[in-house]
């Protein structure tokens, strides 16, 4: 059975299609299952979706930028090359820069925007692993199952984090920062029970899971600086 969909010269792995479907389902969850369904958050939802779409496009086609010489010599081969850890890092950088630009341009609540994007990723990963379960390294004779149920671990952590984000009321540092740090540490730790650290089945260095935590800290500092500038301007 083929594990990829061929459209002309392009080859799209089914795991990528499943990830896209999971992200779409996660947006529906944001739109109808959270407090972001309110009309006052419409712009936040739209920009969150735009930023996510930009990240997906960069992940799928970032290989062109990373391998320009090869692209000029054999463009079809490069375009059919699946995205990996480097493309994912490039996508994260583009999403972070795009987020800052949109926050400044539209005077958006940066914490709310980060929460929307982070929630979509966590919900999507939970959905993805529910339908695409994976097992990790052997457990030996210590546990009743032969291999670590990595997907179960990820779903459990994702469920706890989603509950925290949507039921814990408070400021950015009280609500989002702890959730991001808990998720980053847990996903980094889970990787040691798997054959390799992965995100949506894409092998990545374990340090990649700390990127959202770094982004949350950057956002917190950015928000504080903005507030001080506004306060100084008003006084």
At which residue positions do the language-model features occur?
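Hydrophobic, membrane-interfacing alpha helices
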Residues: 1-235
